[in-house]
């Protein structure tokens, strides 16, 4: 009888332990779940804050672009800057706190680049040359770009139209119209990720058919030197050496760089411009100065006749 009572007490004790263990697990799981929900709610709140901070940066950039200015020039850190001929310089600070967060934005001059929609054959060919593309590839890519943007199905000597693209493993048609985004160039015959981004700058998520070692030249990439917007004229204050050489030739490019080092051009010269109207804005908002941020990219075109802007491109998912 005594042994039976002891056995029953032992079973009861074990059951109590099991219940306590189960309750402990449930409480721990509940606490963890609550902490996760609180953290998720806080992150969501900070993501919303970061988005609106980034949006405020875009609006600040637009306000700058709408100011009355006479010429643009390159700043050391924050892209293109605006100035008047009387020596007035627009505010240079493009990183500042707002509330508990922080905003940082950059303005990039799209007219410091070659407009791929209006560039001549010679200009495209020379851009490929200064970025390291072999001569045989230059002819193919140049003619294929011209075929992509023209409105007919007649192929250039080294180009490609529908009869080429429709035979690919994943077929598509030539656009026969202007490029809307730079990434469309990756669809053009001959343009590889290495040629587009630069051999050392291809994003990890971009498919590469050839290994890096297969390329003999150190391609610097054409993406940073071309645009799909703007008048097609080059801003001689903000254009890179490669763009200047592709547009004006080596000798004139060196003259422009030398004069630029002595002081910014305040009047148009060499067939270029000094006052741009098309810009890319990259704005980043940080919530509470923490790791959570949001980035917005926009291409803004300013009306030359009155203080109005047109948004040509908008991306909130960078």
Task: Name every feature range the model reports, one short phrase each.
Residues 2-318:
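Compositionally biased linear targeting/interaction segments
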